[in-house]
Each structure stands twice: as C-alpha cells, then as structure tokens.
Amino acid sequence: MPDILHRISIDAPVARVHDLIAGTEGIARWWTGRPLDGSAGIGGRFGVYFADADKPAAVMRVTADTPGEISWRVEQGPGSWLDTLITFTLRPHGEEGTTLLFTHAGWQEASEFMSGCSTNWGAYLTSLKTGAESGRFTPYPQGEISRWS
C-alpha cells in the first residue's frame, strides 16, 4: 500500500508543535480554518469541516497521543481516506527545534487524488511550520493548492 510521507524542520520546541497537532483549536489554526467538533484526546473522535459544509469532510479517531507521536485513524471521509492512518512523529532537533515526520498511510492504491492530497498536506504542514515559528498560519482555503470538486 502506498503512503504519503513528508519531513519538515520547524524552528519551535516539540511541545509547541505537539500542542498545535494534538488539540482541536490548534488543528483549526493550521489546517481547517474553522472549528472542529469532538475531542482530540486519546480515544477521542473529531470531525474536520471545510468552507461552509454542514457535514464533516472526515472524522478522525485519535489512536496515539504522546509527546513524540500523534496518530489519527480516518473513520469517515472520502472513500480512499477510509481506514487510513495519519501520523505525526516529533523529534527534538538542536536546542529549540523540531523535526516532524508525517505519514498518511494505508492508501489502497496510488492515484491522482492521492497525489493531490500529498500536495495539500505539504501546504498545510507548511502552515503548521510557519504558525509554530511566527504565529502566522495559512489554513484552508488559503493553504489549499490542489482543488477537488
């Protein structure tokens, strides 16, 4: 099964990056641009909303939340996202930096949709990076590069 992989260096402490990924308010700041519903603690479920949608684009279950790793299992979402696993691995880098290893694993097959998702993940991870470093985020729709209708 193919996976989406990204590696990002962030000039911010692991704890700050973790907080932006592990809580629904943080996720909204760098990714969705609007509030999530549910809870992002271990075992929790949260819905991801974009634009003016009434229904979540995806529902995630938090399967890991440690200082060095956060994982979400996709329980609802676009067909090819179902049952995939999104993992953020955080490692200290230097005195105050973080290396983020991102994996969106378990895709059934490589596809044009998957490549577009990879492009957008790169943009949203850049939003996470710049937000953690400077407080300036570019969530959806500003951060979206590849549009799917």
Predicted features, each with a name:
Residues M1-D37:
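Hydrophobic ligand-binding cavity/cleft-lining segments
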Residues D3-R7, R45, A57, E69, ...:
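Intrinsic-disorder/low-complexity, polar/charged segments enriched in Ser/Thr/Lys/Arg/Asp/Glu/Gln
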Residues I8, A58-A64, T84-P92:
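Hydrophobic/aromatic beta-strand elements that line small-molecule binding cavities or substrate pockets
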Residues V14-A15, T63-G68, T89-T99:
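A short, structured loop/turn motif at beta-sheet edges
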Residues V17-H18, I27, F46, V62, ...:
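Hydrophobic pocket/interface hotspot
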Residues D37-Q76:
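Glycine-rich portal/gate segments that line the openings of hydrophobic small-molecule binding cavities
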Residues E75-T130, P139-P141:
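Beta-strand/loop substructures that line and gate deep hydrophobic ligand-binding cavities in soluble
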Residues R136-S149:
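Acidic/histidine-enriched, glycine/proline-rich intrinsically disordered or flexible terminal extensions
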